[in-house]
Amino acid sequence: MPNAGRTLAGALVATTTLVLGIVPTAGAGAVDDATLTPRTDFVVQPLRPDGSTPPPPANGEKIPNIDSVKATVRTYYGATGTGIAHKTSSPYISEITALQQDVLDALPDPAPRPDLAVVLDVDDTLLWTYDMVDAAMHFHVDPEVRDEEWVQPGRFPAVPGMVDFVAEVSDRGYDVYALSERSPAQEEATLANLAAAGYAGFTRDTVLTGSRAAQSLVELKAGLRAGLEAQGTTIVLNVGDQYADLLGGNAEETVKLPNPTYYRPSPNIEGAPTSDADLVLPTEFEMAANGASGRTTPGDRIPNVDNVLAEIRAYYGAVNGIADQQSSPYLTQMTAFAKRWKQKLTDVCARGMRKGLRPAVVFDADDTTLMTYDMEDAAMEFNYSTTLQNVWVQESRFPATPRMPGVVAAAAKAGCTIVGLTGRNNAQRVATLDNLARWYHDARGNPYFRSAHYFTKWTSSDTPPAHVDCTVDGNPAGCSSLDFKASTRRLLQERGMRIVANFGDQFSDLIGGSSARPVKLPNPTYYLP
């Protein structure tokens, strides 16, 4: 961890998956890098109707990496690195305009009788919130900021193609209504925003809002539709980007628009149609780590950001962004992981010492020896900041990665040299060693990580060391952390060390050989190619 900006770049990843902690035992450098690739198949359960989170996977590697999810979403929306969606061409625009055409092809022209209506949700059905959700809020929506800086000023553009879609539906003789969970206090701003976005004909009588007090989202929307039907209107079509927009009946047909950027769970109403059971998100997903799947994957086949974040937090037992340090699926996994590797390292280090091989074990820093979760979630809300990261580093604020002090101690006691190898830069070296010394030391307080065997990356103003081969990652245009780490392991072995194991939470910590055993720790909170 971390490189400045922490962007996802490079060639498409392969699809082979390395099972956590199960690695080849071939000689140094003999491990095939093609096996060191992120998994691409996932099962993600949506939030329950009451908003609670289903049990997460016991293995963190089975949780979609949130950086990869965001990269996939941005590819799907044709979004820039700053989170601004492309307004004229993207996989999202292609999918949603095709859906609009399919609906128009099936909708009788003209309307076969009076008092037939099409009902549409507002946010991400009529008005497009993507730039707010990504660029302004980084997928962490603040209701107050949303209201004051986006809803009231009317800053949302129209969802691509929907202005023409609504006009065509109206021209065919159907009444058009907008139903929204926006509050009555936001009604005037919503009407003005719809007009500014290009919609004609919406009035206070056709844009219906309601208070969510003491009722669920489904109850609100179904109640508004029931009110229209009580006035003699037949709703032939209900369109929304959330299944909660569609549940509860009172519409002959429903159309779900794609939206992987957030998820609104809601209990259904009593007496809802049995067909509502089909109105659910998929749970099985295929996703490449680098975001490329967004070019070809339908929007609702991308893991939903809200559901993935909920799963990650449940895995770490996090409350308000702070991981549970006493009990969580992550701690359970790390306990089993540490038990296995303490014994393995005790055996292999002792064997190396008997053979006079100068055995060594290499450890990455972030989320291998030092746990960054609270910074990533509570402090950054999964929106990485190099400035804030440096504050945490310089103040040595990170706890030890659970159970890893025992792993390091076992290797040291069995005779292995403890080597630290991190993408943190030289200006963070002293603070990192100080942070490690708090958690990684022998009974007399002597630190296991020592300056002579601790390697940090150069700063942007430094020249890379002569031993670094900047082509290891296949990109000669620059020197990556992968280049630095692989080259440094090679240098250590050239100097006579035998690296019996290399521990890291990123596959880029492990690729490049010069280690008998690459060992991957779980980390769904960020991805470094």
Which positions does each model-derived feature cover?
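N-terminal secretory signal peptides that target proteins for export/translocation
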Residues: 1-5
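C-terminal cap/substrate-recognition subdomain and adjoining C-terminal extension
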Residues: 32-41, 68, 183, 187-292, ...
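Structured segments of extracytoplasmic/periplasmic soluble domains
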Residues: 102, 106-110, 129, 133, ...
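Surface-exposed patches in mature extracellular/periplasmic domains of secreted proteins
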Residues: 110-118, 174-181, 206, 236, ...
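Asp-based phosphoryl-transfer active-site loop
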Residues: 114-129, 359-372, 420
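A solvent-exposed, charged loop/short amphipathic helix patch at secondary-structure junctions
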Residues: 134-153, 377-395
